[in-house]
């Protein structure tokens, strides 16, 4: 029961990232628009008083604020999209359902617009009168104040309706409403039922949330910030931190803005106070991230690099530099945290405690800095330094330096004292055992604990992604012995790095689990193994040319541990400068991943090359890519393979660095040319 709930919470947590991802853009508009009204800035730059500039800044401020004002609706649509695999019908159903749910609650409880503003009648101060109202005006609908929770509930229900009814068949005379068209209809019915239920169930829940909010924020806020920091970091490995911090950011606490509107949630209150130009009282649950993200974790990365074995320092240095810079600039810490989370849990325990103290120290010092994305340098500039007189952002720098020193010496001491297997200090890998192509999916399934142990099965171009029921049944060493370059464990989620064949293994495993294919007999396997084997290996010398116009970098500098660690093979990193990827040699297209972000090629001499366009671009679901070729198509060197929208990738992917990997280098030598500036006619590698 718990594991089932945990799996669902993981999916909800991932779904919440979609609406949260909108906030940085809205926050930037709001921050810049507000900064252009700042009196001190206007004194320095009087041209900001120009009517056109004032209008532009007002538009920017309003454009950013409207996003924060309508977060519940965005959470409804975003949650539905995330849980329904990105289908737009689910988003439409969530939008319709959210409106109907609110209208239903308003009618059942006879809420009117007069009720919404009755809190102000007879009150001495609006802020006192509207402190904890139970009602709200949502998109012009007088209804209960359910906040982002209402949006999440309706989004999850709309996704459930989609997954349940998207392929429903109806009688011929109702055929027009069959399939996906039925989803908004059934969601409307579910929304009415939900509205009626919440009309009676939500008020006591709301009272409980208000009581909890008052207790946490008013009884001992200092202790609360410390506990918040510890729990928030502790949930990172399980992917549940988004669920945990959402009530603090979007619901707990209240503030009445200058327009007389009630604003709830630490992050939303900070943004409202930014716009109103008043002293900041919010930010207790965001500010604590800045010292350890900008200073502490990069120092920890240096400690890990320092303790790597000499022969591994170059690779580890590239990984740690990339991860440390990412944490400093953007506040994205997972690449760095996951590098030591599972191999050295004691380090993560130290990190969690220090994160808690960071929130506590920032609160005690009265530093109040908001954020929309994460606690990196970019947010620090926008929400801290631009408002330094109100946020006290300058204090982050000396505090951060202290945290950098503490992180470095604690990590360095723990690594040496406990002989921790941090990156660059790992044991040698297990030797790979033979498994025929036909038998490999069966062996992997067995190593994962059998089909009864598989909760969810997926793959991308580089790794097999499996959510298991019981992690103790998984034979990690066995998976590595079957050819996986590495196995990453995140909670009950296993990622086995099988390279380009990962997707095929997934499809075969799915067919095995559904009974479509059966295990080959031992006789067949023996015959396969005893007959003269078919080797896919390069014959002679193969010249490999640049896959486009751009820059060549060492593979160790690619910002992804799987590629930089050469888990899939050796090669180079390519930074494209034009949106066209071309064939590096004459050969055949062997694979085009469904999301178009990766291409597998085989040269006429048998050299297999994987071109993986960007990092984590599988999550773009094909957006930004246009394939110009088909699987099994013959191509010539410099022939265009893929058109890429580089601007879109830069905005939506962690990096446009494109690993180019030779995946079958066994018994062959790879010579990498000393080339930096590349074009399709330039030789960059040779396989001998």
Curated annotation (Swiss-Prot):
Family matches, as CDD domains: PTS_IIB_glc (cd00212)
GO MF, one example: protein-N(PI)-phosphohistidine-sugar phosphotransferase activity
Top-level enzyme category: transferase
Domain PTS EIIC type-1: 3-427
InterPro entries (alphabetical): Dup_hybrid_motif, Glu_permease_IIB, PTrfase_EIIB_Cys, PTS_EIIA_1_perm, PTS_EIIC, PTS_EIIC_1, PTS_Glucose_EIICBA, PTS_IIB_1
Residue ranges constituting the PTS EIIA type-1 domain according to the UniProt record: 560-664
Chief site of localization: membrane
EC number, UniProt record: 2.7.1.-
Domain called PTS EIIB type-1: residue spans: 438-519
Annotated GO CC locations: plasma membrane
Cellular localisation: Cell membrane
Catalytic residues in the record: 460, 612
Highest rank taxon of the organism: Bacteria
Keyword Cell membrane recorded: yes
GO terms, biological process: D-glucose transmembrane transport; phosphoenolpyruvate-dependent sugar phosphotransferase system
Bilayer-crossing regions: 12-32, 81-101, 137-157, 182-202, 223-243, 284-304, 315-335, 340-360, 364-384, 395-415
Membrane topology annotation: Multi-pass membrane protein
This protein's UniProt keywords: Cell membrane, Kinase, Membrane, Phosphotransferase system, Sugar transport, Transferase, Transmembrane, Transmembrane helix, Transport
Domain notes: The EIIC domain forms the PTS system translocation channel and contains the specific substrate-binding site.
Function: The phosphoenolpyruvate-dependent sugar phosphotransferase system (sugar PTS), a major carbohydrate active -transport system, catalyzes the phosphorylation of incoming sugar substrates concomitantly with their translocation across the cell membrane. This system is involved in alpha- and beta-glucoside transport.
Protein name as it appears in the record: PTS system glucoside-specific EIICBA component
Organism name: Staphylococcus aureus (strain Mu3 / ATCC 700698)
Gene assigned in the entry: glcB
């Amino acid at each position: 029961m718990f594991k089932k709930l945990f799996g669902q919470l993981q999916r909800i947590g991932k779904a919440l990232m979609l609406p949260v991802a909108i906030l940085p853009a809205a926050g930037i508009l709001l921050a810049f628009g507000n900064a252009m009204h700042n009196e001190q800035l206007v004194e320095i730059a009087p041209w900001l008083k120009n009517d056109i500039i004032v209008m532009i800044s007002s538009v920017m401020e309003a454009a950013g604020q409207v996003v924060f004002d309508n977060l519940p609706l965005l959470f409804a649509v975003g949650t539905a999209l995330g849980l329904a695999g990105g289908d737009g019908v689910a988003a439409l159903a969530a939008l319709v359902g959210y409106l109907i749910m609110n209208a239903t609650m308003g009618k059942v409880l006879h809420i009117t617009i007069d009720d919404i503003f009755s809190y102000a009648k007879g009150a001495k101060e609006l802020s006192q009168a509207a402190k904890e109202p139970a009602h709200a005006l949502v998109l012009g609908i007088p209804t209960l104040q359910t906040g982002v929770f209402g949006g999440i509930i309706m989004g999850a229900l709309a996704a459930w309706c989609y997954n349940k009814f998207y392929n429903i068949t109806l009688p011929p005379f109702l055929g027009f409403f069959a399939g996906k068209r039925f989803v908004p209809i059934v969601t409307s019915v579910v929304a009415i039922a939900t509205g009626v239920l919440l009309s009676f169930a939500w008020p006591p829940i709301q009272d409980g949330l208000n009581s909890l909010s008052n207790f946490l924020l008013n009884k001992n806020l200092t202790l609360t910030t410390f506990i918040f920091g510890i729990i928030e970091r502790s949930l990172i490995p399980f992917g549940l931190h988004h669920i945990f911090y959402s009530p603090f950011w979007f619901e707990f606490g209240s503030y009445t803005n200058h327009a007389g509107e009630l604003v709830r949630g630490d992050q939303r209150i900070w943004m409202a106070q930014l716009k109103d130009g008043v002293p900041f009282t919010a930010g207790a649950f965001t500010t604590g991230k800045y010292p350890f993200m900008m200073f502490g974790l990069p120092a920890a990365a240096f400690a890990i690099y320092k303790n790597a074995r000499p022969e591994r320092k170059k690779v580890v240095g590239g990984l740690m530099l990339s991860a440390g810079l990412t944490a400093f600039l953007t506040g994205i810490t997972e690449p760095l945290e996951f590098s030591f989370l599972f191999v050295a849990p004691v380090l993560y325990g130290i990190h969690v405690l220090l994160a808690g103290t960071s929130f506590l120290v920032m609160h005690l010092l009265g530093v109040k800095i908001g954020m929309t994305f994460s606690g990196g340098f970019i947010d620090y500039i926008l929400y801290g330094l631009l408002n330094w007189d109100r946020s006290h952002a300058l204090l982050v720098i000396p505090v951060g330096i202290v945290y950098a020193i503490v992180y470095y010496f604690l990590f360095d001491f723990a690594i040496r004292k406990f002989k921790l297997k941090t990156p660059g200090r790992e044991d040698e890998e297990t030797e790979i055992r033979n498994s025929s192509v036909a038998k490999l999916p069966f062996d992997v399934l067995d190593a994962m604990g059998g089909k009864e142990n598989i909760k969810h099965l997926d793959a991308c171009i580089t790794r097999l992604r499996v959510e298991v029921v019981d992690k103790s049944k998984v034979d990690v060493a066995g998976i590595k012995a079957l050819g996986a370059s590495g196995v990453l464990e995140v909670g009950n989620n296993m990622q086995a790095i099988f390279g380009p064949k990962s997707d095929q293994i997934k499809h075969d495993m799915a067919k095995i689990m559904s009974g479509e294919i059966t295990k080959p007999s031992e006789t067949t396997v023996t015959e396969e193994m005893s007959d003269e084997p078919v080797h896919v290996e390069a014959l002679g010398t193969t010249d490999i040319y640049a896959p486009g116009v751009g820059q060549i970098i060492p593979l160790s500098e690619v910002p992804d541990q799987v590629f930089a660690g050469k888990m899939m093979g050796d090669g180079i990193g390519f930074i494209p400068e034009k949106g066209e990827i071309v064939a590096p040699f004459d050969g055949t297209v062997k694979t085009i991943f469904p999301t178009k972000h990766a291409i597998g090629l085989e040269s006429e001499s048998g050299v297999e090359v994987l071109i993986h366009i960007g990092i984590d671009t599988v999550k773009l679901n094909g957006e930004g890519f246009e394939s110009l070729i088909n699987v099994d198509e013959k191509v010539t060197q410099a022939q265009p393979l893929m058109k890429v929208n580089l601007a879109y990738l830069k905005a939506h992917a962690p990096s446009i660095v494109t690993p180019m990997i030779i995946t079958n280098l066994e018994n062959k030598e790879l010579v990498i040319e000393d080339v930096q500036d590349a074009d399709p006619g330039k030789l960059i590698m040779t396989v001998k």
